[in-house]
Amino acid sequence: MTKSYSESGPAGEPQAQAPPGWAAGCLSPPADGPEADKKEEDLEALHGEAEEDALRNGEEEDEEDELDEEEEEEEEEEDDEQKPKRRGPKKKKMTKARLERFKLRRMKANARERNRMHGLNAALDNLRKVVPCYSKTQKLSKIETLRLAKNYIWALSEILRSGKSPDLVSFVQTLCKGLSQPTTNLVAGCLQLNPRTFLPEQSADAAPHLPPAGAPFAPPPFPYASPGLPSPPYGTMDSSHLFHLKPPHAYGAALEPFFEGGLPEGAGPAFDGPLSPPLSINGNFSFKHEPAADFDKSYAFTMHYPAGPLPAAPAHAAVFSGAAARCELPGDGLAPYEGHPHHERVLSAQLSAIFHE
Protein backbone atom coordinates (compact mmCIF):
# COMPACT_ATOMS: atom_id res chain seq x y z
CA MET A 1 0.00 0.00 0.00
CA THR A 2 1.46 3.37 -0.97
CA LYS A 3 1.85 6.19 1.48
CA SER A 4 -0.03 9.35 0.70
CA TYR A 5 2.47 11.53 2.58
CA SER A 6 6.15 11.61 2.28
CA GLU A 7 8.32 10.95 5.15
CA SER A 8 9.10 13.82 7.41
CA GLY A 9 12.38 15.52 6.97
CA PRO A 10 15.10 15.80 9.45
CA ALA A 11 13.18 18.53 11.27
CA GLY A 12 10.10 16.45 11.33
CA GLU A 13 8.20 18.70 8.90
CA PRO A 14 6.12 17.06 6.22
CA GLN A 15 7.34 17.61 2.66
CA ALA A 16 4.90 18.89 0.02
CA GLN A 17 3.92 16.20 -2.43
CA ALA A 18 3.49 16.94 -6.12
CA PRO A 19 -0.13 17.19 -7.19
CA PRO A 20 -1.58 14.38 -9.17
CA GLY A 21 -1.60 14.49 -12.91
CA TRP A 22 -5.25 15.52 -13.33
CA ALA A 23 -4.77 18.52 -11.02
CA ALA A 24 -1.67 19.62 -12.84
CA GLY A 25 -3.52 19.46 -16.10
CA CYS A 26 -6.36 21.62 -14.76
CA LEU A 27 -4.09 24.25 -13.21
CA SER A 28 -1.59 24.67 -16.06
CA PRO A 29 -2.66 26.06 -19.50
CA PRO A 30 -3.10 23.50 -22.17
CA ALA A 31 0.17 22.93 -23.88
CA ASP A 32 -0.39 22.69 -27.61
CA GLY A 33 3.25 22.27 -28.48
CA PRO A 34 3.79 23.46 -32.10
CA GLU A 35 1.04 26.18 -32.08
CA ALA A 36 2.45 27.98 -29.06
CA ASP A 37 5.87 28.04 -30.58
CA LYS A 38 4.46 29.59 -33.77
CA LYS A 39 2.66 32.33 -31.82
CA GLU A 40 5.80 33.24 -29.91
CA GLU A 41 7.78 33.37 -33.10
CA ASP A 42 5.15 35.62 -34.69
CA LEU A 43 5.25 38.01 -31.74
CA GLU A 44 9.02 38.17 -31.83
CA ALA A 45 8.91 38.78 -35.56
CA LEU A 46 6.44 41.66 -35.10
CA HIS A 47 8.63 43.24 -32.41
CA GLY A 48 11.67 42.91 -34.62
CA GLU A 49 9.89 44.45 -37.59
CA ALA A 50 8.72 47.38 -35.47
CA GLU A 51 12.23 48.01 -34.23
CA GLU A 52 13.60 47.78 -37.74
CA ASP A 53 10.95 50.22 -38.98
CA ALA A 54 11.82 52.67 -36.23
CA LEU A 55 15.48 52.43 -37.00
CA ARG A 56 14.81 52.85 -40.69
CA ASN A 57 12.61 55.90 -40.06
CA GLY A 58 15.28 57.47 -37.85
CA GLU A 59 17.93 56.79 -40.42
CA GLU A 60 15.73 58.22 -43.15
CA GLU A 61 15.11 61.37 -41.12
CA ASP A 62 18.81 61.74 -40.48
CA GLU A 63 19.48 61.25 -44.15
CA GLU A 64 16.86 63.85 -45.05
CA ASP A 65 18.40 66.34 -42.63
CA GLU A 66 21.82 65.67 -44.05
CA LEU A 67 20.48 66.11 -47.56
CA ASP A 68 18.83 69.40 -46.61
CA GLU A 69 22.04 70.62 -45.02
CA GLU A 70 24.02 69.58 -48.05
CA GLU A 71 21.58 71.38 -50.33
CA GLU A 72 21.81 74.52 -48.21
CA GLU A 73 25.59 74.31 -48.21
CA GLU A 74 25.57 73.87 -51.97
CA GLU A 75 23.32 76.91 -52.34
CA GLU A 76 25.59 78.92 -50.07
CA GLU A 77 28.61 77.77 -52.02
CA GLU A 78 26.91 78.82 -55.24
CA ASP A 79 26.15 82.21 -53.72
CA ASP A 80 29.71 82.45 -52.48
CA GLU A 81 30.99 81.62 -55.93
CA GLN A 82 28.94 84.46 -57.36
CA LYS A 83 30.04 86.88 -54.60
CA PRO A 84 33.65 87.52 -53.58
CA LYS A 85 34.78 85.13 -50.90
CA ARG A 86 34.77 86.42 -47.35
CA ARG A 87 37.59 85.67 -45.02
CA GLY A 88 37.06 84.49 -41.50
CA PRO A 89 34.32 82.36 -40.00
CA LYS A 90 31.05 81.92 -41.78
CA LYS A 91 28.17 84.09 -40.70
CA LYS A 92 25.71 82.25 -38.53
CA LYS A 93 22.01 82.45 -39.02
CA MET A 94 20.37 85.28 -37.05
CA THR A 95 17.89 83.70 -34.71
CA LYS A 96 15.48 85.66 -32.56
CA ALA A 97 17.50 85.12 -29.38
CA ARG A 98 20.73 86.17 -31.09
CA LEU A 99 19.00 89.23 -32.51
CA GLU A 100 17.83 90.28 -29.05
CA ARG A 101 21.32 89.81 -27.61
CA PHE A 102 22.79 91.81 -30.47
CA LYS A 103 20.38 94.70 -29.88
CA LEU A 104 21.11 94.70 -26.17
CA ARG A 105 24.87 94.83 -26.78
CA ARG A 106 24.46 97.73 -29.20
CA MET A 107 22.32 99.67 -26.73
CA LYS A 108 24.93 99.23 -24.00
CA ALA A 109 27.75 100.28 -26.33
CA ASN A 110 25.83 103.37 -27.45
CA ALA A 111 25.16 104.35 -23.83
CA ARG A 112 28.86 103.99 -22.98
CA GLU A 113 29.90 106.12 -25.95
CA ARG A 114 27.28 108.76 -25.16
CA ASN A 115 28.44 109.01 -21.54
CA ARG A 116 32.06 109.23 -22.68
CA MET A 117 31.32 112.11 -25.07
CA HIS A 118 29.27 113.93 -22.44
CA GLY A 119 32.16 113.70 -20.00
CA LEU A 120 34.63 114.89 -22.65
CA ASN A 121 32.47 117.89 -23.60
CA ALA A 122 32.00 118.84 -19.94
CA ALA A 123 35.77 118.70 -19.37
CA LEU A 124 36.39 120.87 -22.45
CA ASP A 125 33.82 123.42 -21.25
CA ASN A 126 35.62 123.64 -17.91
CA LEU A 127 38.93 124.05 -19.75
CA ARG A 128 37.50 126.87 -21.88
CA LYS A 129 36.62 128.74 -18.69
CA VAL A 130 40.22 128.52 -17.45
CA VAL A 131 42.23 129.47 -20.55
CA PRO A 132 42.63 133.22 -21.24
CA CYS A 133 40.20 133.35 -24.14
CA TYR A 134 36.58 134.29 -23.66
CA SER A 135 33.94 135.26 -26.19
CA LYS A 136 30.17 135.37 -26.07
CA THR A 137 29.90 135.05 -29.83
CA GLN A 138 32.19 132.13 -30.61
CA LYS A 139 33.03 128.85 -28.91
CA LEU A 140 36.54 127.53 -29.33
CA SER A 141 36.85 124.23 -31.13
CA LYS A 142 38.23 121.20 -29.33
CA ILE A 143 41.62 121.27 -31.02
CA GLU A 144 42.02 125.03 -30.51
CA THR A 145 41.06 124.68 -26.85
CA LEU A 146 43.67 121.96 -26.34
CA ARG A 147 46.37 123.93 -28.18
CA LEU A 148 45.68 127.08 -26.18
CA ALA A 149 45.66 125.10 -22.93
CA LYS A 150 49.01 123.52 -23.85
CA ASN A 151 50.52 126.95 -24.61
CA TYR A 152 49.07 128.38 -21.40
CA ILE A 153 50.58 125.58 -19.31
CA TRP A 154 53.93 126.06 -21.04
CA ALA A 155 53.88 129.83 -20.42
CA LEU A 156 53.02 129.37 -16.74
CA SER A 157 55.76 126.77 -16.32
CA GLU A 158 58.27 129.21 -17.85
CA ILE A 159 57.16 131.87 -15.37
CA LEU A 160 57.63 129.47 -12.47
CA ARG A 161 61.01 128.35 -13.77
CA SER A 162 62.40 131.86 -14.26
CA GLY A 163 60.73 133.36 -11.20
CA LYS A 164 60.31 136.72 -12.95
CA SER A 165 57.29 138.66 -14.06
CA PRO A 166 56.86 137.96 -17.77
CA ASP A 167 56.86 140.49 -20.55
CA LEU A 168 53.30 140.88 -21.80
CA VAL A 169 54.24 140.71 -25.47
CA SER A 170 56.34 137.56 -25.12
CA PHE A 171 53.66 136.01 -22.91
CA VAL A 172 50.99 136.58 -25.56
CA GLN A 173 53.32 135.32 -28.28
CA THR A 174 53.75 132.09 -26.32
CA LEU A 175 50.00 131.78 -25.85
CA CYS A 176 49.22 132.29 -29.55
CA LYS A 177 51.88 129.95 -30.93
CA GLY A 178 50.27 127.59 -33.44
CA LEU A 179 46.77 129.02 -33.08
CA SER A 180 44.52 130.15 -35.89
CA GLN A 181 43.94 133.82 -36.61
CA PRO A 182 40.41 133.97 -35.09
CA THR A 183 41.67 132.40 -31.87
CA THR A 184 44.63 134.79 -31.83
CA ASN A 185 42.23 137.71 -32.19
CA LEU A 186 40.18 136.39 -29.28
CA VAL A 187 43.24 136.09 -27.03
CA ALA A 188 44.38 139.58 -28.02
CA GLY A 189 40.92 140.96 -27.32
CA CYS A 190 40.90 139.44 -23.84
CA LEU A 191 44.29 141.03 -23.11
CA GLN A 192 43.39 144.32 -24.88
CA LEU A 193 46.19 144.01 -27.44
CA ASN A 194 46.33 144.45 -31.18
CA PRO A 195 47.45 141.22 -32.89
CA ARG A 196 49.67 143.16 -35.31
CA THR A 197 51.71 144.59 -32.46
CA PHE A 198 52.95 141.24 -31.17
CA LEU A 199 52.69 139.02 -34.27
CA PRO A 200 54.48 140.93 -37.05
CA GLU A 201 55.15 137.76 -39.02
CA GLN A 202 51.41 137.26 -39.53
CA SER A 203 50.94 140.72 -41.03
CA ALA A 204 52.45 139.50 -44.30
CA ASP A 205 49.20 137.70 -44.95
CA ALA A 206 47.24 140.91 -44.54
CA ALA A 207 45.80 142.91 -47.39
CA PRO A 208 48.40 144.49 -49.72
CA HIS A 209 47.12 148.02 -49.08
CA LEU A 210 47.86 147.74 -45.33
CA PRO A 211 51.41 148.63 -44.24
CA PRO A 212 53.26 145.93 -42.29
CA ALA A 213 53.73 146.30 -38.56
CA GLY A 214 56.82 148.36 -37.75
CA ALA A 215 57.04 150.00 -41.19
CA PRO A 216 57.51 153.80 -41.16
CA PHE A 217 54.29 155.70 -41.56
CA ALA A 218 54.20 157.76 -44.74
CA PRO A 219 52.22 160.96 -44.13
CA PRO A 220 49.85 162.06 -46.88
CA PRO A 221 51.09 164.72 -49.31
CA PHE A 222 48.38 167.08 -48.10
CA PRO A 223 48.81 168.90 -44.78
CA TYR A 224 45.20 168.31 -43.68
CA ALA A 225 43.66 165.19 -42.28
CA SER A 226 41.45 162.94 -44.36
CA PRO A 227 37.65 163.28 -44.01
CA GLY A 228 37.38 159.92 -42.28
CA LEU A 229 39.60 160.99 -39.35
CA PRO A 230 38.58 163.49 -36.68
CA SER A 231 40.28 166.85 -36.87
CA PRO A 232 42.97 167.31 -34.20
CA PRO A 233 42.29 169.79 -31.41
CA TYR A 234 45.21 172.07 -32.24
CA GLY A 235 45.42 175.52 -33.75
CA THR A 236 47.54 174.35 -36.64
CA MET A 237 47.28 171.45 -39.05
CA ASP A 238 50.91 170.41 -38.74
CA SER A 239 51.18 166.63 -39.12
CA SER A 240 53.74 166.36 -36.34
CA HIS A 241 50.96 166.86 -33.79
CA LEU A 242 49.31 163.68 -34.95
CA PHE A 243 51.92 161.51 -33.30
CA HIS A 244 51.96 162.92 -29.78
CA LEU A 245 50.43 159.76 -28.45
CA LYS A 246 50.70 157.91 -25.19
CA PRO A 247 50.35 154.18 -24.83
CA PRO A 248 46.82 153.20 -23.83
CA HIS A 249 46.64 151.99 -20.26
CA ALA A 250 45.16 148.73 -21.51
CA TYR A 251 48.61 147.74 -22.79
CA GLY A 252 50.08 147.68 -19.31
CA ALA A 253 53.63 148.36 -18.26
CA ALA A 254 55.06 145.86 -20.75
CA LEU A 255 54.64 148.15 -23.75
CA GLU A 256 55.79 151.40 -22.12
CA PRO A 257 59.42 151.02 -23.32
CA PHE A 258 58.14 151.22 -26.87
CA PHE A 259 56.68 154.69 -26.21
CA GLU A 260 59.16 156.21 -23.74
CA GLY A 261 61.71 157.32 -26.31
CA GLY A 262 59.19 159.34 -28.27
CA LEU A 263 58.21 158.71 -31.81
CA PRO A 264 60.25 160.36 -34.54
CA GLU A 265 58.61 162.61 -37.06
CA GLY A 266 56.93 160.71 -39.84
CA ALA A 267 56.88 157.41 -37.95
CA GLY A 268 54.44 155.69 -35.68
CA PRO A 269 50.86 154.56 -35.78
CA ALA A 270 47.93 156.65 -36.89
CA PHE A 271 44.97 157.46 -34.70
CA ASP A 272 44.20 154.24 -32.84
CA GLY A 273 41.92 154.48 -29.86
CA PRO A 274 41.67 151.80 -27.18
CA LEU A 275 40.49 148.47 -28.47
CA SER A 276 37.15 147.05 -27.54
CA PRO A 277 36.52 143.29 -27.40
CA PRO A 278 36.64 141.71 -30.86
CA LEU A 279 33.59 141.70 -33.03
CA SER A 280 32.47 138.59 -34.91
CA ILE A 281 31.45 139.24 -38.50
CA ASN A 282 30.68 135.96 -40.30
CA GLY A 283 33.16 134.11 -38.14
CA ASN A 284 35.99 136.65 -38.67
CA PHE A 285 37.00 138.73 -35.68
CA SER A 286 37.98 142.37 -36.02
CA PHE A 287 38.77 145.04 -33.48
CA LYS A 288 36.61 148.12 -33.08
CA HIS A 289 38.48 151.31 -32.29
CA GLU A 290 36.70 153.41 -29.73
CA PRO A 291 37.32 157.15 -30.01
CA ALA A 292 39.13 158.71 -27.11
CA ALA A 293 37.48 161.15 -24.76
CA ASP A 294 39.36 164.07 -26.36
CA PHE A 295 37.82 163.28 -29.71
CA ASP A 296 34.23 163.38 -28.48
CA LYS A 297 34.23 167.15 -28.83
CA SER A 298 33.72 168.61 -32.26
CA TYR A 299 35.90 171.32 -33.69
CA ALA A 300 34.26 173.38 -36.40
CA PHE A 301 36.51 175.03 -38.90
CA THR A 302 36.04 177.06 -42.05
CA MET A 303 37.90 176.45 -45.26
CA HIS A 304 38.40 178.89 -48.10
CA TYR A 305 38.26 177.31 -51.53
CA PRO A 306 39.43 179.03 -54.70
CA ALA A 307 36.63 180.66 -56.67
CA GLY A 308 37.75 179.31 -60.02
CA PRO A 309 37.32 175.72 -61.24
CA LEU A 310 39.58 173.08 -59.81
CA PRO A 311 42.65 172.31 -61.91
CA ALA A 312 43.58 168.87 -63.16
CA ALA A 313 44.79 166.07 -60.90
CA PRO A 314 48.57 166.76 -61.22
CA ALA A 315 48.05 170.20 -59.72
CA HIS A 316 46.56 168.95 -56.46
CA ALA A 317 49.73 169.72 -54.53
CA ALA A 318 49.74 173.31 -55.78
CA VAL A 319 46.13 173.82 -54.86
CA PHE A 320 46.57 172.56 -51.30
CA SER A 321 50.09 173.82 -50.73
CA GLY A 322 48.81 176.68 -48.63
CA ALA A 323 46.02 174.77 -46.98
CA ALA A 324 47.56 175.26 -43.56
CA ALA A 325 47.29 179.01 -43.98
CA ARG A 326 43.75 178.81 -45.32
CA CYS A 327 42.49 176.55 -42.50
CA GLU A 328 41.43 178.76 -39.65
CA LEU A 329 40.17 177.53 -36.33
CA PRO A 330 38.42 180.41 -34.61
CA GLY A 331 37.87 179.65 -30.96
CA ASP A 332 35.11 182.16 -30.12
CA GLY A 333 31.84 183.12 -31.64
CA LEU A 334 31.15 179.77 -33.32
CA ALA A 335 28.10 177.65 -32.74
CA PRO A 336 28.67 174.12 -31.48
CA TYR A 337 28.52 171.04 -33.69
CA GLU A 338 24.82 170.54 -33.10
CA GLY A 339 24.08 174.02 -34.41
CA HIS A 340 25.15 173.32 -38.00
CA PRO A 341 25.20 169.60 -38.78
CA HIS A 342 24.29 170.27 -42.40
CA HIS A 343 27.43 172.33 -42.93
CA GLU A 344 29.63 169.51 -41.66
CA ARG A 345 27.95 166.94 -43.91
CA VAL A 346 28.38 169.19 -46.96
CA LEU A 347 32.01 169.79 -46.08
CA SER A 348 32.68 166.06 -45.69
CA ALA A 349 31.02 165.36 -49.04
CA GLN A 350 33.13 168.05 -50.72
CA LEU A 351 36.36 166.68 -49.30
CA SER A 352 35.43 163.17 -50.41
CA ALA A 353 34.70 164.42 -53.91
CA ILE A 354 38.11 166.16 -54.03
CA PHE A 355 39.88 162.95 -53.00
CA HIS A 356 38.11 160.75 -55.54
CA GLU A 357 38.48 163.06 -58.55
UniProtKB/Swiss-Prot annotation:
Placement of sequence motif Nuclear localization signal: 90-96
Location of the bHLH domain: 104-156
GO cellular component: cytoplasm; nucleus
Composition skew (Low complexity), residue ranges: 9-25
Disordered as annotated region, ranges: 1-96
Keyword Repeat: no
Database matches in SUPFAM superfamilies: HLH, helix-loop-helix DNA-binding domain
One Pfam family from the record: HLH
Biased composition (Basic residues): 84-96
Compositional bias annotation for Basic and acidic residues: 35-58
Biological process (GO), any one: positive regulation of eye photoreceptor cell development
Function: Acts as a transcriptional activator that mediates transcriptional activation by binding to E box-containing promoter (5'-CANNTG-3'). Acts as a differentiation factor during neurogenesis. Induces photoreceptor cell overproduction in vivo and de novo generation in vitro. May play a role in photoreceptor cell production.
Subunit structure: Efficient DNA binding requires dimerization with another bHLH protein.
Protein name: Neurogenic differentiation factor 1
Organism for this UniProt entry: Gallus gallus (Chicken)
Phylogenetic placement of the source organism: Eukaryota, Metazoa, Chordata, Craniata, Vertebrata
Protein's gene: NEUROD1
